[in-house]
Amino acid sequence: MWLAAFVFALTLPVFYSCSGDDNGKTASANVNANNAQVFPEYARMEMPHIKDGSRIIIHRTDAFGVNYIVEWDDGLRAQRWTCYRLDPDNSVKKGSRSGWWHGKDPFAEDELIPAAYRTTLTDYSQMTPHYDRGHICPSADRLNSKEANQQTYLLGNIQPQLNGFNTGVWLYMENKIHGNSYDNIKGWNNTAFRDTLYICKGGTIDNNNYTRSNTGLVIPKYFFAAILRVKNGQYNALGLWFEHKNDHSTSLKAYACSIDELERRTGIDFFCNLPDDRERVIEAAQPNDALWGLE
């Protein structure tokens, strides 16, 4: 069961599920950093700059603290992004979807979002044509506990996706992050490659870059991922931009871009808690194809 504390700061409502200590570290002060005086989670490295008036949803577990964070737009009934991190502590594997759910449907409404603004299982089941319930923070990135895994199935972490996209290039991108031995994909989430991966993903819900389903769900025209790798004090970033269409590509090279370019396309200020001088260099750099294994 999730425990929620409803807190308001400025115009930003913040919602917590469960408890636990936050292991985020506040970066040096800079002009575009989030204000973390009241909510220290805002200073986490994976956090983008928060859009004024948005609802911030923080899901936590007792064992691992912050599981993931969502920016939710009440007016659109849609999430703008989910951000999370991968590190040696939260990357331990203690179970699997099949072992935990035994064929049952684990998807559920996100009760940290007020009923008037949340999406529902019926919104998805009555969609015509059909769209998948596409994870933003994937189930496979949260296998450290049943609680953490279950939270990835909350509809606040879900966007409608075409099946040929969800099971195609989006799945391939997910596998490149966490690895997939069955398909012989070596992922980035390993100690040889990273100390920590900071990840922000989502679909476009601004500037009319979306359509709507017959049930009123926002359907993004594009999806994106911003990934920051930290290893031995070295920082490298990768932006990924996907048109939302049936696409079974098994190469990410054509979708890769700098974080600056991804910010231009999405209107989102990624990794805003980095010191400004470091942020400018990291986000302007073009992706290192060899480092990321882009093919």
Region locations from a protein language model:
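Bacterial N-terminal signal peptides
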Residues: 4-13
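Domain-level detector for secreted/extracellular nuclease and nuclease-toxin modules, and
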Residues: 13-295
